[in-house]
């Protein structure tokens, strides 16, 4: 039988390869035949509302749960047949930081280094390097219980790099963070990707995927309904729109346009001929528009039906 899994994009062999992946909890199917591949060094974003199957996908790929059907390979090893080999090559960070509040930042890192087989001296050196890399050097001697949410999340990421992973899995890493902390964490993730780490990111923040991911897949009801670059997915739902808002900010009218100068002139002429008055703005398609078109609901406005796998991820941490 020929392999129907999409080939990885240009740039090298696949870091992750998934074919016909299925997962169910009782009679509830959460993953219904997923097919995708992620190239080495790529940032791949998996989008979807709560309950779409994002955490279930992470759980299978990180060997926390065996798949009920299909195959999945990570870093060249089958997650069901060679889970130990997979675990040695990956790191996982979830929605809450798995750090010890009583210890200082450098103590957290040094302890994990020792548990990972590093000598005391090497573990301390590595801890210092990671504090610098993740912008925590000034706080390294403080107890983690005094850290802000963003600092705790950065320390959690740093712990994943005590032994550098081939593939980093991030399950909604900025959930609960304020805007500033979220953007600071984005900067850290970008630096990791620029250094060559493969990043598999799940998120329901569409701006996050737009900012970070080389490619995105939209997951809905346990199935991938679209895959591509953010730009390619946006182009599927049409062009730009000229919007007219009244003095209260309410949308009065919108006119489609192709984004060219002549197209904009025609749109403005249409509004002028109709005698409409107000504030004009140009709106380009967003990933939120893509999500609405593909699933019928915005990612952050879906009913929060829990992914049954979420508890598995939290219990593992």
Q: Where would I find each of the regions flagged by the language model?
A:
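Short, charged/small-residue-rich alpha-helical element at the C-terminal edge
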Residues: 232-317
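Catalytic Walker B motif of ABC-type/P-loop ATPase nucleotide-binding domains
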Residues: 168-171
